[in-house]
Each structure stands twice: as structure tokens, then as C-alpha cells.
Amino acid sequence: MPKTHSYETTVTWTGNTGSGTSGYRDYERANEISTAGKPAIPGSSDPAFRGDPARWNPEELLVASLSQCHMLWFLHLCSAAGVVVTSYRDQPIGTMTETEDGGGHFTEIALRPEVGFAEPAQAARAAELHKRAHELCFIANSVNFPVRCDPV
């Protein structure tokens, strides 16, 4: 029987500058993402939508979520296969298209992991393990756009 997991967070708008949402330019997009027992994450919208560039926006969090999920599966699979990873860094790129009505959607996210191995010969298994990590990634299995893995 499948296991069900539940995730709870709190998103609190902190951008009321005194007049609420009385006008498009009259409020900040600042918010705080939190959950019990963890540091809060400062959030905002993308700067293109009047957001604070110093805060995380939902689009960045989605891209990071896909990258992190893939990495964690990849590390697990490498460990199980006896492939010793010594470093891992990904610089993923998400592409979002804005529609004429102001909405939009992601069209693709490209993961670009750069992985170091204890023994360079172990890198040969990396492509197979990246493919399997992608197949198992909970987040990649939950989105309706392509997620590519292009190892560096």
C-alpha cells in the first residue's frame, strides 16, 4: 500500500505598508515562508512583478525544489551503487513564459549538475543514475512541463 506524506507550511504576507492593497503600487510583495522548527524563508515576487530581489520568489523556489529533489535521489542512488560522490553543484535554469493576460507557466527546467567522484572511473555510471534519479524525483513527477538533466 502506498505511503502518504503530508507537508505543512505557513505563508504570511508582511508587505502591508499601511493602506493594504488599496492600489497596485501601494503594497509590498514581501512574505515569510515558515514551518515549525525551521528558520523562516523571506519571500517576495519576482522583481519583474514589483518584488524584492533580495528575497526568494516562488519561481526560484520551484527551480530549487526540482534541483534539490534530483540531487537527493542521485546521492542516494550513488551511495546504494557504491559510487562515491565527493561534490555536487547544480545551477539549474527555469524558463517561464508570460501570457498576454498576465498569467504564465514554466515551459522547461534544465538541471545542470556538476558532480565530483572519488574515483573518476565511477563517473561512467553517472548518466544511468541521473536518469533513475529523474524517474524517482517526487517533484519532477508532479509538474506538467519537461525537466531535463544536462550534467556538466
Where are these regions (language model features)?
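Extended beta-strand/beta-hairpin segments
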Residues: 1-64, 72-152
